[in-house]
Amino acid sequence: MKLKKFFAGVLAAAMMLTVGATAAFADTPAAITHNQALTATSEIPLYKTYEVKNGTAPAETFSFQVKYLQVIRQDKAATAPYNTETVINLTGKETAFGSMTKGSESKSFTVTPTELGLGNPTGTGKYLYEISENAGQTVATTYAAPVYMAVTVAHKVDATTKQIKNGEYEYYV
């Protein structure tokens, strides 16, 4: 009986030490970071990584399309930038890679809120876009699956008075 109590006490002490030790050695929480506000002409970088696992790949230029999908939420005054499922023309938004032997390389291109149809908003809202890679003709190349991007249009706020600036907007991705 005494042996059972002894082991129960050791187990309880070990459990308390693990909880206490974890808290004692924990780092301070990371500082909260906020996305920077963008303007209608701010460049939003989009990245493409070209990876060759085996062999040599020929030079290739990847092109992309952006499709406006839907409004996630918007105020009553706002109008959507496009009809649902509208493909936005991104002529000249390609990434070119030279011939490569085993390895990977990343490049980027940019889009702006104006190119996404949000240059002259009529109100606040959150809009969803699909970015997809146009499939090329290179043998043994797997083209990337679509990715999604949400863009939020918010009222610009005066830094001093903290009041909304009517008719002025900022963007968050």
Locate the predicted segments by residue.
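Solvent-exposed loop/turn and edge beta-strand elements of beta-rich ligand-binding domains
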Residues: 2-173
